[in-house]
């Protein structure tokens, strides 16, 4: 007779040990947790202890025990009832079934609910089959929607029916884990071929990891719209919160989180070596090396390593360009070095550290060019569904879309309605009632979909006494407003108020900078126990007496607002500010904006921040980009108030083939100084823009419904494929450009292919006029349901923007593509032909 299984037998000891360490560090918080654990079964208590042992301090401070109990109880039930789950290696179960956190999302109870919704649909299925089925359920409940950077909880994505890719994948991972399928989120932190990033999901079955697109179901695993894009990535990573690290290449840590390199599953890779030397030319052991890609016109880190005793660091990456920087602190002084490396041609590079303070010596204040190359398209995951599977999947996806659209059609957050609809009985409440819509109005669209009425009530009730002490817009934005940054919206004002006597409150109002002094004394930062992007709420900081530097800055603003002092984090650099004599002043003297940079735009370029330029400040051996908002050039001039220090301006020209022409300008600005710099964007030649991308075969139809292969249409020489959306402005623009250059385009008319949805499109005014002028253009038909998306993704342009225009040179060989309307597209097409 077999011995009964023991829950977490192999890891029980280390779980208990790590839990006790957490409890020892935060005794006040863990005392009530211990009491509640005593009421749980042995297995559930151990599961809870695992969560508490390896969660960030921010989770401990932000959420009550009952939230984590849902995850623990569901995990234990799966282990007891599902033999597949019980047979999992313990580390897989702990990290990828039981654990509550996926990335940096808000945590809310969801697992038990999701299991109840999904469980009956996957009865009798193995993990592979269940993963595919769960993803169809996810598509029925949520789809992509561009939103702000705060990451919703999985249950909020489910309720509102949409989220950005990072939220869709958080939702899908939670859905998979809820029914026992081991799952994790993986990220291309930044693409190399375009300005964006992407997150998707991996599931573990048959002893290995497979991928799928979150809320984007397919009939097979290892297929998604991003399959080709991921082959051009320089890094794809996963993360683990446990201290017992799985096998794999560690590419950095974010506090308590370890990042793992997953690129080999998606792309052709190689190992590169970076050697760092100190100012004496000797190996710099312990230097921090940052590997970065140029994205949104800033160098964004994708991996970080420390050098060994020989001063070397190694990384497995793709075949493209990396910006590599190194930093090191010695005797309180920071040293820095940087270079650009094309890994397609180079295996090694060397960096020589120099003092950060001597980085800009005056002679270096000039524009320096850098050529940034994106990896070539080289897919390693080539599995495709059969025609039968594809047809089945299309039918199921269409049904999922109908279900979801019906669900969200008239959805709104009932908590907002409850908050707005509260009955008013007294004069004081009547005053507060007038600010209810103002409070909701100052929140983001995302906030309004997951805010809680009781939370808003406390903020309104305790802020309203200060409403007459300042201008209304100042009061609403910087006192009443419950949001400071991207923290979870929770109550905190009553908790803060009870910590101070009446006299102390007045002293802090008289000199708000003293609030920071109190925070520095009372709140300890433990970065090794946190994840930098997961914020401890103001109330959580007070409960645990811990918080990251950002969390403490948010606490400063929260205390100030609670006391009726208008305060904020500066939107450019997140420095703390409070209002004094009608203007915001810095809390810390070192963040005072005591210099002015005058940027000149020139005549020909439309400058857009984080699109073709950015500016970053060098501090502690690391450049950090300023978060400029809607600042616009007036009369070709932009005035930027800055702190004194060393800066780097980047300009970048992204080419259609994914490569970039970059320009760098390093400078130092002194207190009181005004400096003028003219922005310069590098221009590209035609040959720099072209690609050679093999497009998949697809079919178009003639007027009588006969199917024609695209390979036949593109067989001889160059062609222009134009998928048109008649009577829509972007399509009208390109048609007008073509008619304005009628003579030039007429010479290529037989090589131009217009694709429309119906014959009626040809009768619309602008399109019919264009066809009359350019008589030999070929006309074909498609319903735009699938081909548009496939070709747009394949050519690395936005498939949701029409017209989609592709220039081919030879059979199904795409050399150029654009989507939507861009000024000068007509001229570009003529140059290409």
Region spans (language model):
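Secondary-structure boundary elements
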Residues: 3-160, 390, 395-544, 554
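Short active-site neighborhood of thiol/selenol oxidoreductases, capturing the structured segment around
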Residues: 710-734, 751-754
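Short, internal strand/loop/helix patches
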Residues: 768-802
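A short, hydrophobic beta-strand/beta-hairpin element that forms part of a small beta-sheet core
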Residues: 799-820
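Short, acidic Ser/Thr/Gly-rich low-complexity loop/linker segments typical of extracellular
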Residues: 295-317, 620-638
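Hydrophobic/aromatic-rich core segments of domains that either
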Residues: 2, 116, 120-136, 145-156, ...
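Short Pro-Gly-centered beta-turn/loop motif in secreted/extracellular proteins
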Residues: 312-325, 329-331, 340-343, 632-657, ...
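A short, amphipathic beta-strand motif
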Residues: 270-281, 595-605
């Amino acid at each position: 007779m077999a011995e009964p299984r023991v829950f977490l037998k192999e890891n029980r000891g280390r779980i208990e040990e790590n839990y006790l360490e957490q409890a020892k560090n935060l005794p006040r918080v863990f005392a009530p947790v211990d009491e509640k654990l005593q009421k749980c079964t042995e297995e559930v208590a151990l599961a809870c202890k695992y969560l508490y042992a390896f969660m960030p301090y921010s989770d401990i401070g932000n959420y009550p025990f009952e939230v984590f109990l849902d995850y623990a109880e569901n995990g234990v039930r799966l282990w007891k009832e599902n033999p597949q789950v019980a047979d999992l290696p313990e580390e897989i179960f702990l990290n990828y079934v039981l654990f509550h956190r996926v990335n940096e999302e808000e945590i809310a109870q969801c697992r038990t609910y999701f299991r109840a919704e999904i469980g009956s649909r996957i009865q009798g299925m193995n993990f592979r089959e269940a993963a595919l089925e769960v993803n169809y359920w996810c598509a029925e409940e949520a789809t992509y929607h561009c939103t702000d950077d705060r990451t919703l909880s999985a249950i909020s994505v489910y309720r509102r029916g949409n989220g950005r890719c990072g939220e869709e994948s958080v939702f899908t991972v939670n859905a998979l884990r809820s029914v026992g399928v081991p799952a994790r989120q993986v990220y291309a932190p930044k693409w190399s071929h375009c300005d964006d990033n992407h997150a998707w999901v991996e599931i573990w079955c048959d002893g290995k990891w497979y991928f799928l697109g979150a809320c984007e179901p397919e009939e097979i695993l290892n297929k998604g719209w991003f399959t080709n894009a991921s082959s051009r990535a320089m890094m794809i990573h996963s993360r683990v919160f446990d201290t017992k690290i799985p096998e794999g290449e560690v590419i950095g840590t974010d506090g308590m989180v370890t990042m793992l390199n997953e690129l080999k599953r998606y792309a052709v890779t190689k190992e590169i070596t970076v050697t760092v030397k100190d100012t004496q030319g000797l190996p710099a052991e312990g230097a921090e090396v940052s590997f970065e890609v140029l994205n949104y016109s800033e160098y964004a880190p994708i991996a970080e390593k420390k050098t060994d005793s020989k001063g070397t660091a190694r990384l497995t990456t793709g075949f493209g360009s990396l910006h590599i920087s190194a930093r090191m602190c010695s005797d309180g002084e920071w040293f820095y070095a940087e270079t650009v490396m094309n890994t397609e041609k180079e295996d090694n590079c060397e960096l020589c550290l120099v003092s950060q303070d001597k980085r800009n010596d005056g002679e270096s204040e000039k524009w320096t060019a850098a050529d940034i190359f994106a990896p070539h398209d080289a897919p390693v995951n080539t599995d495709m569904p059969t025609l039968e599977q594809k047809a089945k999947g299309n039918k199921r996806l269409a049904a999922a879309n109908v279900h979801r659209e019906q669900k969200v059609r008239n959805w709104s957050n009932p908590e907002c309605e409850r908050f707005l609809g509260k009955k008013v009985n007294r004069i004081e409440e009547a005053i507060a009632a007038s600010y209810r819509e103002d409070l909701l109005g100052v929140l983001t669209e995302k906030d309004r979909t997951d805010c809680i009425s009781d939370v808003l009530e406390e903020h309104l009730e305790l802020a309203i006494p200060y409403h007459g002490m300042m201008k209304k817009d100042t009061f609403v934005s910087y006192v009443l407003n419950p949001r400071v940054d991207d923290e979870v919206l929770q109550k905190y004002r009553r908790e803060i108020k009870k910590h101070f006597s009446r006299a102390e409150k007045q002293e802090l109002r008289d000199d708000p900078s003293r609030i920071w002094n109190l925070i520095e004394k009372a709140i300890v930062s433990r970065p090794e126990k946190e994840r930098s992007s997961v914020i401890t709420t103001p109330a959580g900081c007070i409960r645990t007496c811990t918080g990251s530097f950002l969390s403490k800055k948010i606490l400063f603003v929260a205390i100030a607002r609670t006391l009726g002092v208008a305060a904020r984090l500066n939107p450019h650099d997140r420095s703390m500010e409070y209002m004094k004599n009608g203007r915001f002043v810095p809390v810390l003297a070192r963040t005072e904006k005591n210099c002015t940079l005058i940027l000149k735009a020139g005549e020909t370029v439309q400058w857009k921040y984080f699109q073709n330029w950015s500016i970053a400040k060098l501090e502690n051996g690391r450049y950090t980009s300023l978060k400029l908002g809607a600042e616009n050039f007036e009369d070709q001039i932009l005035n930027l108030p800055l702190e004194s220090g060393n800066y780097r301006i980047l300009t970048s020209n992204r080419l259609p083939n994914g490569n970039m022409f970059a320009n760098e300008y390093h400078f130092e600005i002194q207190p009181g100084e005004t400096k003028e710099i003219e922005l310069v964007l590098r221009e590209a030649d035609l040959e720099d823009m072209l690609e050679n991308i093999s497009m998949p075969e697809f079919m178009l139809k003639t007027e009588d419904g006969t199917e024609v292969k695209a390979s036949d249409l593109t067989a001889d020489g160059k062609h222009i494929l134009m998928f048109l959306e008649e009577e829509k402005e972007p399509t009208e623009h390109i048609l007008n450009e073509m008619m304005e250059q009628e003579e030039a385009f007429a010479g290529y008319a037989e090589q131009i292919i217009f694709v429309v949805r119906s014959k009626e499109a040809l009768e619309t005014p602008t399109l019919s006029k264009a066809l009359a002028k350019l008589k030999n253009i070929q006309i074909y038909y498609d319903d735009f349901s699938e081909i548009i998306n496939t070709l747009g993704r394949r050519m690395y342009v936005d498939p949701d923007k029409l017209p989609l225009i592709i220039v081919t040179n030879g059979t199904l060989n795409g050399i150029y593509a654009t989507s939507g309307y861009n000024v000068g597209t007509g001229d570009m097409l003529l140059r290409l032909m």
